[in-house]
Amino acid sequence: MTEVARYTQLILPVFWLGMVVAISFLEAPIKFRALGVTLAIGLGIGRKVFFALNAVELVLALALLASCVAAPPGATALTVLALVTVVLVVQVAVVRPPLGTRSDRILAGENLPRSRMHLVYIGLEAAKVALLIALIFQLFRAVASCLP
């Protein structure tokens, strides 16, 4: 069980980081530049994609937590995992609801200025990327210390 937990600690944060970078920093901005993608279409796609991304992220965070219970990686790694999870929860529970309301209004035909909450979400995504990189290093260090 401990060996599976350690492999989980190596694989899941790298997968999580790849998903966030690919979706938040590649797919999201590029889709609005695609020919024929209107703001309404882009918002509709974005809502679905980010709902799915955040759902998978929550599962990954829980799976990583479970692996850390099975094979504790040390206080620093646990702290970084907690911080990444807090950032995710803030995004889902605090920032996304007003963004959803705003996109509903835009889809209903209102012409609204850019939202600061969108910038907050992007800032949290950048923080999450930095924390995931730190988590990867901490977990790799913890797993390496268990090797013969």
Question: Model features per residue range: what roles?
Answer:
Residues 2-64, 106-111, 146-148:
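Interfacial loop at the N-terminal end of multi-pass membrane proteins
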Residues 45-47, 57-82, 139-142:
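Charged, compositionally biased, marginally structured helical/coil segments
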Residues 49-52, 113-131:
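Individual transmembrane alpha-helices with interfacial aromatic-anchor signatures
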Residues 70-105:
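Mid-chain, well-packed structural core segment of small domains
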Residues 133-148:
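Juxtamembrane boundary at the C-terminal end of a transmembrane helix
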